[in-house]
Structures are given as C-alpha cells and as structure tokens.
Amino acid sequence: MIVAALLLAVQVIAQNPRLERLDPDTRSAVTIVVDSARGAGLPVEPLIQRALEGTSKGAAGARIVAAVRRLAADLGAARVALGTGASTPELEAGVAALRAGATPQVIAHLRDVRRPPLTIALSVLADLVASGVPADSAATAVLALAPKARDADLVEFRRAVEHDIALGAPPGAATSVRVNAGADFGNSSGSPGTVPRPRRP
C-alpha cells in the first residue's frame, strides 16, 4: 500500500511538479486526492492551487489536506448539480454558491432555466449572500432573473442591491425590491435607484 502510494505520488508530481513545494507527507496525501479527482473526471487545477495557496500561507499540512479534500468533495457536488458538461469556472462558481448556502436543487434549477455558461449567475448568487442577503432570498432572486437577464444585467443587479444595502436597506428587502423593479437594468446614468431607508426607532 505504501509503495503504491509512493508510485502514485511520483506520477502525479511528474505531471504537476509544483506539488514539490509541499512537504513529503502533505504532498503524498494531496496527490491521492488529486489523482482520485482526476479519475472521477473533476478538474484538478483548483485542487493544486488550493494546496499551493495553503503552503504559501504557511498552513499546517493537515489543514492543507483537509481543504483540498473539502474542495474535491464540493467540486463533485457542484458537478452533480450542474451536469457533466459544466466547465471548470462553472464548477468553481458552483462551489462558491454551495458554500454560500445554495442547495444543489437550486443550482440544478438554475441550470434548467438559464443557458450556459452559468458562471456569472452562480457568482452573483454567492456575492449576494456575502453581502448579507439570506441564501433563500438570493436564490429566489437569481432564479427569477436568470431566464432572461444577461450576465451584465445580473452583475448590475448585484451592484444595485449592494448599493441599497450600503444606504441602510435591509438585505432581503433590497433584493426583493430590485427583483420586482427589474433592477433598473436600463439605467444609463450608472446610478441605480434606491429603496427607502429604514426609519430609525
């Protein structure tokens, strides 16, 4: 078993010499994850980049391995939701959306209602949650806009919601109002309208 693992490590390192930056134990564990992901048809570059990011930040080997394993699992979950034809950027955006709180069912529904690529739509969903919008509200908004909105429209929608939140609007309310108003996609001034600020008690 040990010999097989060492041989596998040599093969993967030959294909990805950057892994030599890892200490031997970490490199061996990461190599197994990378090879397994490759065998499953998942992109391995994000895994390698995650490992290199960890070592560049001085993270402990165990944390690096755990992060790589988690990413591999999340990439697998994203591919199940998005389908085998999903690109690497779509899968990475899918991972971000899943980690933000979107369910696999939401991502699969998005795939059904919007033409690929879905990278921007998934990224907007994740960004909305990061801005404080509840995950279910963000998902509902993106799904409502996805069938007809262009990528640029979705980006503008996200900016408009973030703008309203910065002015004091509750994240959920800002999202709902923007969806109902069409997010002012055609506003040529570049200054989106705002939802009313909440009254101070």
Regions found by a protein language model. Name each.
Residues I2-Q11:
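Sec-dependent N-terminal signal peptides
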Residues V12-P201:
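General marker for long, soluble alpha-helical cores
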